[in-house]
Regions:
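Bacterial N-terminal signal peptides
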Residues: 13-24
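Bacterial N-terminal signal peptides that target proteins for export
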Residues: 3-15
Length: 187
């Protein structure tokens, strides 16, 4: 009797594993992150205000007024200046560099905040993918393919609730957990 129960569970376990392996690629495709195309880097340059973000360790001291400013140095280099205000009112900054990825996808960049002499190390570069962008380059979503990082950026310190909701719905369809987004105070 115990032998038949074990055989029954083993058959069903194998059946479930086969079923999961067949459907797993479909689930991955449904939530695959893709960068936008087409994308023109030149109008993307300038100041962006952080509207919301997924929590991350490197912004743990940022309480409000988070901004990013991008300056095109040459086609292969973009200067990145991130700044925010701490809970004590102090402004902190991080100066970095971005570059296009070698894959030819213009909205897929890599960014580093490590010193330039460490730039040869692949580990210091992080993915920076433009995932959503309005035609006027006024509202953007930036993240990475692992869905660990996500930012909503705007050319203005505030956006309408309707714009925010529409964008978060599109991001949710990409597989991002938008319920974890933290809105950023801008004043």
């Amino acid at each position: 009797m115990i032998e038949r129960i074990g055989e029954f569970f083993l058959k069903h376990f194998i059946f479930c594993l086969i079923g999961l392996s067949l459907f797993a690629p479909l689930a991955t495709q449904a939530t695959q992150v893709k960068s936008i195309d087409p994308f023109d880097i030149t109008p993307y340059m300038g100041r962006w205000y952080e509207i919301a973000k997924l929590p991350n360790w490197f912004q743990r001291n940022c309480a409000q007024n988070t901004q990013a400013t991008y300056q095109l140095i040459n086609p292969a280099q973009i200067q990145v200046l991130n700044q925010c205000q701490t809970a004590h009112g102090e402004m902190i900054q991080a100066l970095g560099m971005a570059r296009p990825r070698a894959n030819g996808q213009p909205a897929q960049l890599e960014v580093r905040f490590a010193p330039s002499w460490l730039g040869w190390l692949p580990i210091v570069w992080g993915d920076y993918w433009v995932l959503d962008l309005d035609p006027q380059y006024q509202l953007a979503a930036v993240g990475d393919p692992s869905k660990k990082y996500l930012w909503i950026l705007s050319r203005t310190p505030q956006i309408s609730e309707a714009s925010y909701k529409a964008l978060t719905q599109r991001l949710s369809l990409m597989g991002f957990d938008v319920s974890r987004l933290e809105k950023t105070t801008q004043n």
